């Protein structure tokens, strides 16, 4: 379950940002999760609650935005949306793809008081 380590890293980022911006209590957090991040949403919610325990983000509302994965094709030099790690370019059929977006998790924004 790599969700816990991802959430621990996100909690560190949230704590740092809250400290930098003078936020005493985080009320909402938006995470951007790539479609190829291999993250289970229910596990992410569970682990996020654990990671934020005893921090400024404890009890905050977690919002998850799933973003599509993008890959760059080395053969036709075009960007394409992909649904799996091992795929083919929808433009030319090549398997020479480099994932450029959508395989990670990011703290998109947070709100607090």
Curated annotation (Swiss-Prot):
Protein residues bound to Zn(2+): 73, 76, 89, 92
Disulfide bond keyword on record: no
A GO biological-process term: protein maturation
Gene3D superfamilies per the UniProt record, alphabetical: 3.30.2320.80
Alphabetical UniProt keywords: Metal-binding, Nickel, Zinc
Sites where the protein binds Ni(2+): 2-3
A Pfam family assignment: HypA
GO MF annotation, one: nickel cation binding
PROSITE patterns cross-referenced by the UniProt entry: HYPA
Function: Involved in the maturation of [NiFe] hydrogenases. Required for nickel insertion into the metal center of the hydrogenase.
Family: Belongs to the HypA/HybF family. HybF subfamily.
Classification via NCBIfam families: hypA, PRK12380.1
Record protein name field: Hydrogenase maturation factor HybF
Organism name: Morganella morganii
